[in-house]
Amino acid sequence: MFNFANFYQLLAQDTVLQPWLNTLPQQLTDWQNAEHGDIERWIKALKKIPEGCADNIDLKSSVTLSNNTPLIDGERKKLENLLQTFHPWRKGPFTVHDIHIDTEWRSDWKWDRLLPHITPLKNRSVLDVGCGNGYHMWRMLGEEARLCVGIDPSHLFLIQFEAIRKLMGNDQRAHLLPLGIEQLPELNAFDTVFSMGVLYHRRSPLDHLIQLKNQLVAGGELVLETLVIDGDENAVLMPVDRYAQMRNVYFFPSARALKVWLESVGFVDVKIVDECVTTTGEQRSTEWMKHNSLPEYLDPNDSTKTIEGHPAPKRAILIAKKPD
């Protein structure tokens, strides 16, 4: 179904990451053997996507690829229909041969908020936990990261990533593995680890922070983004059921409380670098994501609250270091 041989070869040649080969191949074999109702339809469409490197690729200011000679209308429409097979597209946007994949999230806005605050990614190895379809990994490569590894257990996100990678000429600097972080050994191998939009889905947030720390080299940097509430270092919201229609959500600390949590598990130099209310311009339904989105999840009479009565989504970005 999927061939991870190139990634295994990369691990075999990397003395720091090589021990991952003790567990990873069997995990990915088990994943491939598990059935998923839509996977055959998606793979059939993926095989039809043309392979080959575009003449022009921009990963620095966007994720855009084009040829010097544009696709003819029929070819472009065929490609657009194939990409629509992978609906819903949640993270992006992408522009592919004049096809604008207008995703649910303006993930580029988040990237613009965090980029000025992080250690430059040039020549760094990066792990992106809960990477979605890999949009931010392409932006990391635009900042000249040496290697980007993303993990996310979603079949659809892997298909979307492989579709974009195929159009990119099968770029081997980025790899998406269909795993959760709990399946990773303590690699202590990455210069930078990103965890964005994951923490509130974890039953034990402190354990998640420890898992992230265990993926970093000594002195490595964590970039953590999550939903927060207003309040002091003791403020935490734990929704009884749903939050903005999301199930499986647990802890929403204040940014100040999250800073304390990071310090309590051994991170140093912890900084709150951004807090931002999520707007309906940043998250909304589109032709590429036709399901309900943030506008339907807010109280129609009070946009400062979710339909359950909780504070409306607000996200914070924190930067922290693993001690040397």
Curated annotation (Swiss-Prot):
GO terms for molecular function: transferase activity, transferring alkyl or aryl (other than methyl) groups. The keyword tRNA processing applies. InterPro entries: CmoB (IPR010017), Mo5U34_MeTrfas-like (IPR027555), SAM-dependent_MTases_sf (IPR029063). It holds the Pfam family Methyltransf_9. NCBIfam families: PRK15068.1, tRNA 5-methoxyuridine(34)/uridine 5-oxyacetic acid(34) synthase CmoB. Catalyzes carboxymethyl transfer from carboxy-S-adenosyl-L-methionine (Cx-SAM) to 5-hydroxyuridine (ho5U) to form 5-carboxymethoxyuridine (cmo5U) at position 34 in tRNAs. This is tRNA U34 carboxymethyltransferase. The lineage of its organism: Bacteria, Pseudomonadati, Pseudomonadota, Gammaproteobacteria, Vibrionales.
